[in-house]
């Protein structure tokens, strides 16, 4: 026996589900959705049925909802950076504004349908910004609002923007923001902290936020600032998707003048001298917060990019590196942040492949760096064809925590000491190699952690933007901050929709 949607609501009430039926009927009518417009649905597969939900979303959003067999569906699923996230959701809804996001979450909550949310899709963890056939994908790529306050001090950024577009928009005004280091990365990286080339001077991306616009699970659209919903404001700076869907935010700007940059390659046999230079740089050079460096250690060679906030050739902050034999890669020069991001982005392959990142942290220590590098060398020698593991130590200054505290605080629990965020960036072609490559990446950092613990230099903090799916990022913030995340989640999402229906992610209920 089959029923209309109205009939199903009546059937649900007979099963002591009257509140659900009543709320659902009211919800659909409030969105001007007439249940009689839909096909007949089996009452056994009503709530939680992604097919039914997609029919409702198509009726509600029209061309802003894309089904499996529609033109553009495949292209939308393959926006994500890593092929490991190229999966097929039941449908994709692409809201045009916060009001659309509100309608979408109201429908998903009413129909108890699983969902995932995607901004730029650079997160390589399957399910974090992708969804399978049992779920709906909310793509925020159309939320591309960009504006600048009259005094040029605040930039309003829609969460669908990528950082390259943001920098390009702001450059004619001679201002910029503390955003992502790669132009193709989506702006939602702010919710994980967001490491910028000049975070030593200005803090993490999250620390420069002045306002968040957030859609909550009941569909309400709220603002979070240092003085309004201040607990939500702080929790969003590192708390990711536990509270609602961020649709736009305001970032403080800074003057965008010419920057110094230089990139050099170091032969592999120079790694002991390079580690010594890295430690010395953190001990003294990083006290100059205008200085920053980016590292990339690969089988082909070890790349270090030197950056300085002022147009100064070979600043003294980098003195420890100048005596190590090297080969020029980018000669010394000056560039705007827009030009710099574009130039450095050339080094990142645009060819689709399988990607994963994993991270750990420890106090800066030459012996740990040398030990971990040695383990990495052993492991990369065993990799299958068309697979690579990049070893990326990121020096973090002791003052980074204070930068966050200065502007309302964040939820990260950063160590107030010089330390290293060590990333392993995995890239490979063959799905059959998934387990081998992922296990190899984990092995390197497990061994590194064990050695760091033996030296009493291990730090529990995990940088969300570079973490892998199985890492307990929220727990790494410390018990006090984790408990704050739980409290804020329960306050702003009392139905716990984002815990129960949202796909994979760094959610407190899964740690």
Curated annotation (Swiss-Prot):
Domain of life: Eukaryota
GO MF annotations in UniProt: FAD binding; oxidoreductase activity
Its EC number(s): 1.-.-.-
Disruption phenotype: Abolishes the production of arthrobotrisins A to D, and leads to the accumulation of a pair of epimers without the characteristic epoxy core. Shows substantial reduction in conidiation. Shows significantly increased ammonia levels in fungal mycelia.
Keywords recorded for this protein, A-Z: FAD, Flavoprotein, Oxidoreductase, Signal
Modified residues (Pros-8alpha-FAD histidine): 122
Flavoprotein listed as a keyword: yes
Induction behaviour: Expression is down-regulated by the cluster-specific transcription factor AOL_s00215g275. Expression is also down-regulated by the HOG1-MAPK pathway downstream transcription factor MSN2.
Matches recorded under PROSITE patterns: FAD_PCMH
Role of this protein: FAD-dependent monooxygenase; part of the gene cluster that mediates the biosynthesis of sesquiterpenyl epoxy-cyclohexenoids (SECs) such as anthrobotrisins and arthrosporols, metabolites that possess a novel hybrid carbon skeleton consisting of a polyketide-derived epoxycyclohexenol combined with a terpenoid-derived monocyclic sesquiterpenol substructure (PKS-PTS hybrid). The SEC pathway plays an important role for fungal soil colonization via decreasing fungal nematode-capturing ability.
Name assigned to this protein: FAD-dependent monooxygenase AOL_s00215g279
């Amino acid at each position: 026996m089959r029923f209309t949607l109205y009939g199903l609501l009546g059937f649900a009430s007979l099963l002591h589900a009257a509140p659900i039926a009543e709320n659902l009927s009211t919800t659909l009518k409030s969105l001007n959705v007439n249940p009689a417009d839909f096909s007949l649905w089996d009452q056994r597969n009503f709530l939680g049925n992604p097919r039914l939900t997609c029919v409702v979303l198509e009726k509600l959003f029209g061309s802003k909802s894309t089904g499996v067999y529609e033109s553009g569906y495949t292209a939308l699923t393959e926006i994500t950076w890593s092929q490991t996230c190229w999966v097929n959701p039941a449908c994709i809804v692409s809201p045009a504004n916060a009001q659309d996001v509100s309608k979408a979450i109201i429908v998903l909550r009413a129909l108890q349908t699983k969902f995932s949310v995607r901004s730029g899709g650079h997160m390589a963890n399957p399910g974090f910004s992708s969804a399978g056939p049992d779920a709906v994908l909310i793509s925020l790529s159309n939320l591309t609002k960009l504006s600048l306050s009259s005094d040029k001090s605040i930039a309003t950024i829609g969460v669908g923007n990528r950082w390259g577009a943001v920098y390009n928009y702001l450059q004619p005004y001679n201002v910029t923001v503390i955003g992502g280091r790669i132009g193709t990365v989506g702006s939602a990286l702010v919710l994980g902290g967001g490491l910028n080339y000049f975070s030593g001077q200005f803090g993490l991306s999250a620390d420069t936020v002045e306002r968040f616009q957030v859609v909550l699970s009941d569909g309400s659209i709220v603002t979070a600032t240092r003085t309004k919903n201040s607990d939500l404001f702080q929790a969003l700076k590192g708390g990711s998707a536990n509270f609602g869907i961020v649709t736009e935010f305001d970032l403080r700007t800074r003057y965008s003048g010419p920057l110094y940059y230089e990139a050099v390659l170091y032969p592999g046999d120079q790694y002991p001298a390079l580690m010594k230079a890295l430690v010395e740089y953190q001990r003294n050079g990083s006290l100059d917060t205008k200085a920053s460096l980016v590292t990339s250690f690969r089988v082909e060679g070890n790349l270090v990019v030197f950056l300085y906030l002022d147009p100064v050739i070979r600043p003294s902050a980098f003195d420890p590196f100048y005596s190590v034999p090297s080969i020029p890669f980018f000669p010394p020069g000056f560039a705007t942040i827009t030009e710099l991001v574009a130039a450095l982005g050339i080094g990142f392959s645009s060819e689709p492949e399988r990607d994963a990142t994993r991270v750990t942290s420890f106090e800066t220590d030459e012996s740990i760096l040398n030990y971990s590098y040695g383990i990495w060398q052993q492991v990369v020698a065993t990799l299958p064809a068309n697979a690579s593991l990049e070893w990326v130590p990121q020096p973090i200054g002791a003052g980074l925590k204070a930068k966050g505290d200065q502007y309302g605080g964040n939820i990260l629990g950063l160590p107030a000491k010089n330390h290293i965020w060590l990333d392993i960036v995995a890239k490979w072609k063959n799905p059959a190699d998934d387990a081998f490559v992922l296990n190899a990446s984990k092995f390197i950092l497990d061994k590194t952690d064990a050695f760091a613990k033996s030296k009493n230099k291990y730090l529990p903090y995990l940088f969300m933007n570079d973490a892998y799916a199985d890492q307990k990022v929220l727990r790494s913030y410390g018990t006090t901050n984790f408990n704050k995340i739980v409290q804020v989640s329960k306050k702003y999402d009392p139905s716990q929709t984002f815990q129960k229906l949202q796909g994979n992610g760094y959610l407190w209920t899964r740690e």
